[in-house]
Regions:
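Exposed beta-sheet edge and beta->alpha loop/turn motif
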Residues: 106-157
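Short, low-complexity N-terminal intrinsically disordered segments enriched in polar/charged residues
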Residues: 18-57
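Acidic, low-complexity intrinsically disordered segments
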Residues: 41, 57, 93, 151-157
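C-terminal motif of bacterial Sec signal peptides marking the signal peptidase cleavage site
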Residues: 14-15
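Positively charged n-region of N-terminal signal peptides that target proteins for export
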Residues: 1-4
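Charged, alpha-helical scaffolding/interaction elements associated with membrane systems
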Residues: 60-61
Length: 157
């Protein structure tokens, strides 16, 4: 009887093993790092200006909302002064005053023609090691903005 219970328990444990869920992530050959000669300078400047506008809100507490000629509707709806104020309060406390953005790398997703501008965000406190990614779609509109801790290796997400 003990052996039967042990065998059934073992079967139950093995049968209930969790399975890994595969996330759909772009294949490495779908993401191409662009050389400086391949970068569209007007799109680069637009990404820089719009990214800087978001982070300058932390210094000035004033935000000029994006227009439909600058960003997609989802970005316009998601970036509000309330959300920025909460983020800026944390950033100013931890990293100090925002200084500037420094372009580090540019990648392009060849499947959906999204260009990712990777900027290093410079702050007054030396502990700040942040990055800002500005995603520009094929229509030259900001389709996403993301800030995170700086990591040298690029991972598309």
């Amino acid at each position: 009887m003990k052996k039967l219970i042990l065998i059934l328990s073992l079967i139950a444990v093995v049968g209930c093993k969790s399975k890994k869920v595969q996330q759909k992530e772009p294949k490495p050959d779908d993401i191409v790092k662009l050389a400086t000669s391949q970068i569209n300078s007007s799109q680069k400047n637009k990404a820089y200006e719009l990214g800087k506008r978001v982070l300058m809100t932390c210094n000035t507490s004033k935000f000029k909302a994006f227009t439909t000629s600058e960003a997609t509707q989802s970005v316009i709806n998601n970036i509000t002064i309330d959300k920025l104020s909460k983020t800026c309060t944390k950033y100013r406390m931890w990293y100090g005053t925002f200084i500037d953005l420094q372009l580090a790398e540019v990648y392009q997703n060849t499947k959906n023609q999204t260009t990712v501008y990777r900027f290093k965000a410079l702050y007054t406190k030396k502990v700040a090691n942040k990055e800002m990614r500005v995603f520009m779609n094929a229509e030259n509109l900001v389709s996403a903005i993301k800030t995170s801790d700086w990591v040298d290796a690029f991972k598309y997400n």
